[in-house]
Amino acid sequence: MLVWICAGEASGDLLGARLMAALRRQRQGVAFAGIGGPRMAEQGLSSLFPMEDLALMGLLEVLPKLRRLAGRLDQAAAAIAAARPAVLVTIDAPSFTLRLAARVRPLGVKVVHYVAPQLWAWRPGRVKALKQRVDRILALLPFEPAFFEAAGIPVRFVGHPVLEGGAGEGDAARFLAAHPILPGERPVLVMPGSRRTETARLLPVFGAALRQAANDLPGLRPIVIAGRLVEAAVRQAAAGWPNGPILVPDGPGKADAFAAVARAGGAGLIKSGTSSLEMAVAGVPHLVAYRVNPVTAEIVRRLIRVPHASLVNLLAEREVVPERLQEACRPKPLAETLLRLLREPEAMAAQRVGFAEALGRLRPAEGPPSEAAARAVLELA
């Protein structure tokens, strides 16, 4: 049985790798083809082309790449038509993957889309088009099935992969043995994103905020998680940050950094997204920040339908984690919010209560998320 899998960015690559492993555990003789990154390659996938070609974010950021993306779409559709897999699993990256689904579903290929598009958050009218493109959605969040079921789209809540990502299982002692945090230092975990477009916008702002905060709190020590695609840019930017930042590759070792920051009473300055859930699992109080092109931001403002950007806040249905978005994503507001968090133990304790609330709603009844996802895929294959 051939399963064709398409991931478009680092988070999807990790999801795809876990899904591939779970599919192998549940079905003998399964084979894979598709598009993925290094994690999926470790599971035996030979990517049709570099996954990085699809890792774009923001309306204006995508426009200059449209011709290349169209070519990659043609290439992927032709490969699927030739292979005739039992099922196509598209993972997140809906601007590409759902177009691919639309091209191949008329061929009789079953399509499972893993990570529900956030149509419940903005432009809900698009759900009608989605119904024509997929046979099943695998939802990560517990409130998503009701939205898609109302539109007649089969959906399965499989739970969020952060629950099996090991974010809360790090070894603080191991990290501190390699990277001592001195008495009086307050670590700040910095996660500026894994896409080049994100880090290009956030790194200068985060750096300026850390410098401002260090003026009031001289012991502030940045610990920066650097994704593979952006490691060089992160390293270059962090060289000018205060007190000798510690760079940690985005991989299994980052959980040790999370544990060390939590033990040392530190906090996080985090790009809005799944990183916030990782911080919740690890018990690290934090604030989230995000900034996109001003034109993109104005379009999104007109279409957005939810009160929060942070997944922790959406799950808790209140603001657990401070959000500093767009105009508020500037050095001064970020520095002030970070300092307030570091100086107020009660604020940290309140966040941890909210983390437990939010995470309690993420756990599926069917076991680990990747196993639940594999079962849902095999039902259609």
Where do the protein language model's features map onto the residues?
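Nucleotide-activated sugar donor-binding and catalytic core shared by glycosyltransferases
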Residues: 1-381
